[in-house]
Each structure stands twice: as structure tokens, then as C-alpha cells.
Curated annotation (Swiss-Prot):
This is UDP-N-acetylmuramoyl-L-alanyl-D-glutamate--L-lysine ligase. Belongs to the MurCDEF family. MurE subfamily. The gene is murE. It catalyses: UDP-N-acetyl-alpha-D-muramoyl-L-alanyl-D-glutamate + L-lysine + ATP = UDP-N-acetyl-alpha-D-muramoyl-L-alanyl-gamma-D-glutamyl-L-lysine + ADP + phosphate + H(+). GO terms for cellular component: cytoplasm. It comes from Staphylococcus aureus (strain NCTC 8325 / PS 47). Its EC number is 6.3.2.7. One of its GO terms (biological process) is regulation of cell shape.
Length: 493
């Protein structure tokens, strides 16, 4: 596309140079800028990428978007705008032909449950033989092809490119995990949502948002801003078991479908049966009651299942067809995932990293604990520490507790575990400043019949260490290796 045509979509302060050049790429990553690219510089929390403008010029890039004039060669056109990231969003959606308009887009937000609900929607679509894409905490996936991701919600240009990639691959739908950070930072500007789903709201990310009111407002942006294409039918799916849903009803102009277990809703789960092999329940709907079985474990996953089923149903698939698909879904990686059932202990990993998430996790596993419940939990560095003692208190519902850091970054690991220990309600706990050693200790003290839960990370493949360096780390692999060494079995894949 000609740059002069592209920039007709935005208001600029001034242009230094010529816009008569062909553009086939937009990037906010200076390392990928090249001839034919537009490089959009921005002022981030830790890095001002304006300082890389000369680098991109050396790589052949001839057009940059900046918030003030840079010292660059005369053959590099500079477009000066007040808000570079807002302009990046407009340019990306325009250049890539508004990809979110070309498929059904589901957006899932909430403190806990985003990954599970989003993954379930994607897996249901695949069971229905539909081409589908997913983008979130577990990376980027088109059908069964997966790639890793850095953030739950990537920055606006990368996000738009991923949606375009899904469209080009023939995806009929795409499910996005929508983080509060992504909403506040404008990463989702221009994305057209067909269905918005809310799981719950509990304390988290106050290091970023400051207050629960601000955090809640951030989440509400998804429901008030589903997009601008009024020709599409749009729907909102709300969890009536969470009181924040009442507020979300007031901010959305779209039709709402509610689900719940404890509170009255349009769609409800009754006669619930649970085991470590899965759940079953009667799905009570406005159209009748349907028996549902699922391999997912825990009462909280029943809420997630209902949210996913309603979302897919809202776009035209019958409930009977969806329920058949749900019965055969694969587990969501790292979400109440039982590792190697042949072991004499129940070894479980989960992503729970808030007091609410941990409570629900313990509620799910405690009825099936045969001997002791050994619970390992970590606290992340450079995060809201006001929630930490409550996490320690909840962890002490277990018989034995191990406190570790989780992505300590530049914080002192010993400080993080001490903050967790402030909430301890019994003395059966130990602190490790090395998470891997804490996991090995959990296995070392476990006896046949015990349940060992490794919480906070799921299958996250790294630890963020000082200097924000990512060091390879997998809870599941460390736990399995220690368990096989003690009890036999293996090897670790």
C-alpha cells in the first residue's frame, strides 16, 4: 500500500520527507524493521524506542512514526504524531485489511479463568471441525499449530498481525485472552469483538492499576467497546456468581447471557458430581436441561465450561452439538493438570496465583486427598505485595506448605517468601528462595497417597530473574523428574 494512502486515516502534526513509498509491513520492534516497513517508536515503561530510529534506518527502513523529530538521514521520512501507539493501531488495522472483521472474535477477561475459557472455546471449535485460532497466556495457536507468546495480550501491531495470520490460514474464529493491561494500554484498539466473556474479578495487578476500582474499570472496557461494526450481532456472557457482573450489565449496550452455580442465572449447573477424573452436572438452560460430562476437574471449571459453551452457542451452534464436543475435550495445559496418573502420588500443577484462585484450587482437590496435601506456592517479584499474606493464609489450608518466589525479577526472593509466610496460620511450612529446590523438597517429603500441588506457574516455561532475564524453568518437568527418581517410572519427555 502507498504510504500516502495509509496516512490519510490518521491526523499528523507534520511530515518530514515523502510519503510516496510502498509499505508492506508495520512494526514496533526495531529489530524487525526493514525496507518497506513503517517503524513506530514509543515511550515505554522501561525503554524509549525512539533511540533505535537510527538502527532501523541502517536496516533499510525509510519511514518512522515518532512523537518528536529525530536526527536521521534525509532519505528517512518522519511522521510526527502526539500518540504513536494509537497511530500504530490505526495503521496496522488499515494495512492488514481489518482482519478481526473477517472472522468471529471471542474476547475473554477476568482475574482467573481466562486461559481455561479461551482454550475451551478454541478446543470446542476444533471438535466441531472448524478452523480456529487462540491467542493468550499459552501462546498463539492456529488449529493444532502452536507458537510461544510473550504477553497475554501482545502490543497492538503484533496482535493485529496474529489476527491477520489466522485469517490467512482460514480461521473461522479466534479467541483472545484480554488482559486488563492490554485494555488500559490500548493494545486492543480497532479489534472487532463478537462475543465478550467475563469470568470473575478478585484482587490482582494493583501494582499497575492502583485500586480495585481502577482494575474493574479496566476490565469493563471490553464490554463497553466491542467494536464499531454495528452490522454484526454481538453478545456478552457474564458470571452471575461474581457481583461485578451487575456493573458490567450497566456499561454494555449488547445482549447479555448469564451463567452461574450459586446465583440465579439464565444458564446454571445443578446436581454437580466431582472427581479427579472430571466433573458432571445438569446444564439448566432456557431451552431445557442437558447432562454434561467433562474431563476438567473442579467446581470452578464448571463455571469455565458453561462460559465457553454459551459463547459458542451464541454464534449459532446447537447446545447438543457443543455438549458432545465438551465431553471429549483435552485438558487445558497447566490448569489443574494431573501429571502422570501412574505415580503413587497425585502430582498437580496449576496457574493459581491469587488468593481466590488458590482457594478454588484447594476446594477442587481437597475432597480427593487420600493422605497429606502438600501445597507449593510462589509470589512474583515487582508486583502488588498487599495480596501476598492472604495467599499465605489460603495456602495453609494444606497440611504442609512450601513458599517460593515466582519470577522474582529484581526483588529479593527471601523477601517474597517472607511476605507469604506473614499469612501462615500454622507452622508446617518452609521457605525456599529457589523454586526448583522447593519443588524437589515437595516430592522428597511426599509419600504414596499424598497429593502434591505446584501452584502459581502452570506450564510457564521460564523464571524471570534479576535484570528481567528469562531462565528456562518448568514446574512439571522438575516435579516429574524428582517423582520418577523417588518412585520410579519415566522418563521425562
Amino acid at each position: 500500500m502507498d504510504a500516502s494512502t495509509l496516512f490519510k486515516k490518521v491526523k499528523v502534526k507534520r511530515v518530514l520527507g515523502s510519503l510516496e513509498q510502498q509499505i508492506d509491513d508495520i512494526t514496533t520492534d526495531s529489530r524487525t524493521a526493514r525496507e518497506g516497513s513503517i517503524f513506530v517508536a514509543s515511550v515505554g515503561y522501561t525503554v524509549d524506542s525512539h533511540k533505535f530510529c537510527q538502527n532501523v534506518a541502517d536496516q533499510g527502513c525509510k519511514l518512522v512514526v515518532v512523537n518528536k523529530e529525530q536526527s536521521l538521514p534525509a532519505n528517512v521520512t518522519q511522521v510526527v504524531v502526539p500518540d504513536t501507539l494509537r497511530v500504530a493501531s490505526i495503521l496496522a488495522h488499515t494495512l492488514y485489511d481489518y482482519p478481526s472483521h473477517q472472522l468471529v472474535t471471542f474476547g475473554v477477561t477476568g482475574t482467573n479463568g481466562k486461559t481455561s475459557i479461551a482454550t475451551m472455546i478454541h478446543l470446542i471449535q476444533r471438535k466441531l471441525q472448524k478452523n480456529s485460532a487462540y491467542l493468550g497466556t499459552n501462546g498463539f495457536q492456529i488449529n493444532e499449530t502452536k507458537t510461544k507468546g510473550a504477553n497475554t495480550t501482545p502490543e497492538t501491531v503484533s496482535l493485529t498481525k496474529k489476527i491477520k495470520e489466522a485469517v490467512d490460514a482460514g480461521a473461522e474464529s479466534m479467541t483472545l485472552e484480554v488482559s486488563s493491561h492490554g485494555l488500559v494500554l490500548g493494545r486492543l484498539r480497532g479489534v472487532e469483538f463478537d462475543v465478550a466473556i467475563f469470568s470473575n474479578l478478585t484482587q490482582d495487578h494493583l501494582d499497575f492499576h492502583g485500586t480495585m476500582e481502577a482494575y474493574g474499570h479496566a476490565k469493563s472496557l471490553l464490554f463497553s467497546q466491542l467494536g464499531e461494526d454495528l452490522s454484526k450481532e454481538k453478545y456478552v456472557v457474564l458470571n452471575n456468581d461474581d457481583s461485578f457482573s451487575e456493573y458490567l450489565r450497566t456499561v454494555t449496550p449488547y445482549e447479555v447471557f448469564s451463567y452461574g452455580i450459586d446465583e440465579e442465572a439464565q444458564f446454571m449447573a445443578k446436581n454437580i458430581q466431582e472427581s479427579l477424573q472430571g466433573v458432571s452436572f445438569d446444564f439448566v438452560t432456557p431451552f431445557g436441561t442437558y447432562p454434561v460430562k467433562s474431563p476438567y476437574v473442579g467446581k470452578f471449571n464448571i463455571s469455565n465450561i458453561m462460559a465457553a459453551m454459551i459463547a459458542v452457542w451464541s454464534k449459532g451452534t446447537s447446545l447438543e452439538t457443543i455438549i458432545k464436543a465438551v465431553e471429549n475435550l483435552e485438558p487445558v495445559e497447566g490448569r489443574l493438570e494431573v501429571l502422570d496418573p501412574s505415580l503413587p502420588i497425585d502430582l498437580i500443577i496449576d496457574y493459581a496465583h491469587t488468593a481466590d484462585g488458590m482457594n478454588k484450587l484447594i476446594d477442587a482437590v481437597q475432597p480427593f486427598v487420600k493422605q497429606k496435601l502438600i501445597f507449593l506456592v510462589g509470589m512474583a517479584g515487582e508486583r502488588d505485595l498487599t495480596k501476598t499474606p492472604e495467599m499465605g493464609r489460603v495456602a495453609c489450608r494444606a497440611d504442609y506448605v512450601i513458599f517460593t518466589p515466582d519470577n522474582p525479577a529484581n526483588d529479593d526472593p527471601k523477601m517474597l517468601t517472607a511476605e507469604l509466610a506473614k499469612g501462615a496460620t500454622h507452622q508446617n511450612y518452609i521457605e525456599f528462595d529457589d523454586r526448583a529446590e522447593g519443588i524437589k523438597h515437595a516430592i522428597d517429603i511426599a509419600e504414596p497417597g499424598d497429593t502434591v500441588v505446584l501452584a502459581s506457574k502452570g506450564r510457564e516455561p521460564y523464571q524471570i530473574m534479576p535484570g528481567h532475564i528469562k531462565v528456562p524453568h518448568r514446574d512439571d518437568l522438575i516435579g516429574l523428574e524428582a517423582a520418577y527418581k523417588k518412585f520410579g517410572g519415566g522418563p521425562v519427555d
